Amino acid sequence: MVLRQLSRQASVKVGKTWTGTKRRAQRIFIFILELLLDFCRGEDSVDGKKKKDSLTDKTETVTEKKES
């Protein structure tokens, strides 16, 4: 009987720590995904402003030249 109680208590402790570990891992994973998303969008992580993309600037000028 005592062994059964001890094993249940141990499994509860392991379950709680595993839940905390999963939550922490999920938070880290979400942070990395958001960081990658910001990087792919071209936003600067320091001030949140978009960086100028030279490729889009070039395509805009080429498009403007074709229209006129």
UniProtKB/Swiss-Prot annotation:
GO cellular component terms, A-Z: host cell nuclear membrane; host cell plasma membrane; host cell rough endoplasmic reticulum membrane; membrane
Ranges per topology, Cytoplasmic: 1-24
Mod. after translation: Phosphorylated by host PKC. Phosphorylation alters the stability and may also have an impact on the subcellular location.
BP-aspect Gene Ontology terms: monoatomic ion transmembrane transport
Nucleotide-binding found in the keyword field: no
Superkingdom in the source lineage: Viruses
Modified residues (Phosphothreonine): 21
GO MF annotations in UniProt: channel activity; DNA binding
Residue segments, region Disordered: 44-68
Residues bearing PTM Phosphoserine: 7, 11
Phosphoprotein found in the keyword field: yes
Membrane topology: Single-pass type II membrane protein
Stretches assigned to coiled coil: none
Oligomeric and partner information: Homooligomer. Interacts with VP1. Interacts with large T antigen; this interaction may impact upon the activity of T-antigen on the control of viral gene transcription and replication. Interacts with small t antigen. Interacts with host CBX5; this interaction induces the dissociation of CBX5 from LBR, resulting in destabilization of the nuclear envelope.
Family of the protein in this entry: Belongs to the polyomavirus agnoprotein family.
Protein name, UniProt field: Agnoprotein
Species name: Simian virus 12 (strain wt100)
